[in-house]
Amino acid sequence: MMETMPNWLKQRAFLTPDRTAIEIEEEKVTFMQLHEKVVSVCEHLTHVGVNRGQKVAVLMKNGMEMITVIHALSYVGAVAVLLNTRLSREELLWQMDDAEVICLVTDQDFEAKDIPVYSFAEVMNGPKEEASIQEEFSLREAMTIIYTSGTTGKPKGVILTYGNHWASAVGSSLNLGLRDDDCWLACMPMFHVGGLSLLMKNIMYGMRILLVPKYDADFIHKALQTRGVTIISVVSKMLTDLLERLGEGTYPSSFRCMLLGGGPAPKPLLETCVDKGIPVYQTYGMTETSSQICTLSADYMLTKVGSAGKPLFQCQLRIEKDGVVVPPFAEGEIVVKGPNVTGGYFNREDATRETIQNGWLHTGDLGYLDEEGFLYVLDRRSDLIISGGENIYPAQIEEVLLSHPMVAEAGVVGMTDDKWGQVPAAFVVKSGEITEEEILHFCEEKLAKYKVPKKACFLEELPRNASKKLLRRELRQLVEEM
């Protein structure tokens, strides 16, 4: 098996220098122009002492600047630690400390404690020093670290190598195919693996990306009709928004794939897509699998409703219960394997050993396979709340609630929301006088906005089993009765 590959963007700029790489609003950048921008940033990163193997935090919104910085870090051999712009300052500082980053590159007004902070203007236009650019990428080396929340609530840094990203892009192309006129509309945040994976496909396939800096359903709807877009990645909420705008019409015949992630889609939504001739491919994946690992092709949209499909060509999947592989229709844990699967978590040897055994990743998600091998995901890590495509772990919110002196006990579950799918709801046992408003305000200071509970209810005691474990299912019943 090959150990190295030519520097991806540099090779792409050599092969197709004048082809459009990125379109953003009215700006177009070719692969050669992108390469030149990246080299300029490299020279400043070298000047400030960024070296191979060091970790650099990136806190930026979707845009040409973020793309340039991510590629520049790969050019100098540094590891990009991609931070979620929606997190609170405390959460960001914790992740930067945990990842042992040496500096932060950001397009925001952010003051870190112990590390230098550089704006994009500084890294683009600041003092330069000749950079030692990686001519080859070692597929075993780490390229990115992206944080994901564990069931304990403490985030874990998922290490993704050049080999993981390469395998993910190859698997996707074998699944969806490639066309010369392909253009992928990118509206997912690039700090998420789903958004980042499009940057990899962009340079590996030589495919045009239409980049949307911020989710804008009107712009996206119009772009699908007028900008030659052939593929887009969405979650159910986005698909619903687009169908509302589409009315009685449909999208051009050149549009060939609506890649749908973030949990199963409602059957009526899929039926509407079939009626309008919109091909929807449902997917299952996570940060640890470098994006999708299973996809249900549009051929099975209605005959396999609720299924996430079958594994990508070079991937394997099975269902285990108590360490034993179970037969079709038996429920158990989804376990996956493939060259796109992470080798582990940064500085979390115990979590890595627990999660990855003999190359198989234990996802913590529950599901089953039917008699034809199609995957059905039953629960995304049973306690997980998925709100507008964002993963929220109750344990992290509970940790914040319990840090308040007037809170004795806390339990958090998801409650149904028409707009976001789910939002957090908190149940609290008081140890002193406190109001719902005070609790929510306290959370706003400590958590990202989308993690703040939409409701806080007071109980005399939380439901627990004999071993005092919180019974979340009873809290869910209380939410349903509200």
From Swiss-Prot:
One of its GO terms (biological process) is menaquinone biosynthetic process. InterPro entries: AMP-bd_C, AMP-bd_C_sf, AMP-binding_CS, AMP-dep_synth/lig_dom, ANL_N_sf, ATP-dep_AMP-bd_enzyme, MenE. It catalyses: 2-succinylbenzoate + ATP + CoA = 2-succinylbenzoyl-CoA + AMP + diphosphate. One of its GO terms (molecular function) is ATP binding. Its EC number is 6.2.1.26. It is an enzyme of class 6 (ligase). PROSITE patterns: AMP_BINDING (PS00455). Pathway: Quinol/quinone metabolism; 1,4-dihydroxy-2-naphthoate biosynthesis; 1,4-dihydroxy-2-naphthoate from chorismate: step 5/7; Quinol/quinone metabolism; menaquinone biosynthesis. Keywords: ATP-binding, Ligase, Menaquinone biosynthesis, Nucleotide-binding. CDD domains: OSB_CoA_lg. Pfam families: AMP-binding (PF00501), AMP-binding_C (PF13193). Converts 2-succinylbenzoate (OSB) to 2-succinylbenzoyl-CoA (OSB-CoA). Belongs to the ATP-dependent AMP-binding enzyme family. MenE subfamily. This is 2-succinylbenzoate--CoA ligase.
